[in-house]
Amino acid sequence: MEFEEQPISSKTVFHGHLIDVEVQQVITPHGNKTQREIVHHAPAIAILALTADNKMILEKQWRAPIAKITLEIPAGKLDQRDDDNALHAAKRELNEETRYEATSLKKISSFYTSVGCMDEYMTLYLATGLKRVSNELPQDQDEQLMLKEITLPQALEMIDQGEIEDAKTIMAIYYWQGMNNRG
């Protein structure tokens, strides 16, 4: 069975600081003409940061697209400082957002965040052996973060209660649960 669509035209309709939006006219495998709206976003990273007493670090912050405060794991997009290196971005974001560095930063997985409309590709890391940084990098001027440390049972309860709704954070928590189940 054929699945691939053939673009016949494309136009960038918005170019922003964080995203670009492209509108494509495509021909489907059945020969139908339709329109696709695609959000282009830089690659990104996220970090499951675990403290020595086995608590995860979360960030409380405002998210304008959903008009509410969220609890999320540290995350950010790759930028020119990272030279397309996701590990470098993870180290940088961990410093900027939490003021920690990790003696171990291990890749867990890479994934597309929302394949129906966006090409953002995120790499999730596990950070352990956390210690306070000696050289603090500048924080993003447009971010207001408050850190919170929680246990795995608290994290699972917060998912059940709808207090944690962010997909990358839920994925990280379930990975953490699996780590504990494997011993």
Question: What does each model-found stretch correspond to?
Answer:
Residues 21-23, 48, 58, 124-126, ...:
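Conserved hydrophobic/aromatic beta-strand scaffold that supports enzyme active sites
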Residues 9-46, 51-53:
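Acidic, metal-coordinating catalytic segment for phosphate/diphosphate chemistry
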Residues 11-12, 109-114:
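Short, solvent-exposed loop/turn elements at beta->coil junctions and helix N-caps
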Residues 1-5, 69, 107, 122-123, ...:
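Nudix hydrolase/Nudix homology domain
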Residues 2, 36, 46, 51, ...:
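Conserved Nudix-box catalytic region and its N-terminal flanking loop in Nudix hydrolases
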Residues 101-108:
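A short coil-to-beta-strand element that immediately follows conserved catalytic motifs
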Residues 23-30, 114-134:
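Active-site-adjacent beta-strand/loop module that shapes the phosphate/pyrophosphate-binding cleft
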Residues 29-30, 51-53, 62, 82, ...:
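Short loop segments at secondary-structure junctions
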